[in-house]
Amino acid sequence: MIQQESYLTVADNSGAKRIQCIRVLGTNRRYAHVGDVIVAAVKDAAPNMGVKKSDVVKAVVVRTKATMRRETGNSIRFDDNAAVIINDDKNPKGTRVFGPVARELRERSFTKIVSLAPEVI
């Protein structure tokens, strides 16, 4: 579960390395899970890349440490909290996605992120 002021690692090559959640998008939502869109501030970034430190960006959560239950009865969790930076059209800013992503992204119409990911769990 991601909430305000949570830190996430960035799982793409947009230039940001760590982001901090400012707001979970939705009507009066407190927590974000896999597939939810958040507004975040870039806290650590690589030089001469697409995003800079202190930029405000939108990102979609692709991995969480919190255990997630699926409708089939399986439960899944990851080793870190990670997000992919997106633009207003829900397309990723980077051209690569690092690490596994959850299958729930396909159901939320983030098919471009799923196709770039090396592994879908």
Swiss-Prot record:
Disulfide bonds: none annotated. Pfam families: Ribosomal_L14. Signal peptide: none annotated. The gene is rplN. This is Large ribosomal subunit protein uL14. HAMAP family: Ribosomal_uL14. GO terms for molecular function: large ribosomal subunit rRNA binding; structural constituent of ribosome. Part of the 50S ribosomal subunit. Forms a cluster with proteins L3 and L19. In the 70S ribosome, L14 and L19 interact and together make contacts with the 16S rRNA in bridges B5 and B8. Belongs to the universal ribosomal protein uL14 family. The lineage of its organism: Bacteria, Bacillati, Cyanobacteriota, Cyanophyceae, Synechococcales. PANTHER family: 50S/60S RIBOSOMAL PROTEIN L14/L23, LARGE RIBOSOMAL SUBUNIT PROTEIN UL14M. One of its GO terms (cellular component) is cytosolic large ribosomal subunit.
